[in-house]
């Protein structure tokens, strides 16, 4: 298990459902264009693991999601989701232009600027931010 502190990431968006008791379900993640987001913003395939399908469903494995008592506390949920250990689960080399396998992709990207994703790594998925929000 290798830690990648300060790993560069493209612009990410998250969607989830919180019930009245603060229980979280239906976590999703997507990659958006490097611009001010609008409903027409282009979405890209997520190039890493633990995210699958056209909806961007996040696999949290055996990890339990915390409960959030206030809407403000939900701001920490993306950090929690990104801290879940990643493996090859739901990884597909076809989701990056380089065609690299997971470990090789991480090693290749660990010192790159996030702008590199947009020129050399990301593949549009044919969706917009409006599609992602609509679920």
Question: What are these regions, as identified by a protein language model?
Answer:
Residues 38-135:
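Domain-scale recognition of soluble eukaryotic interaction modules
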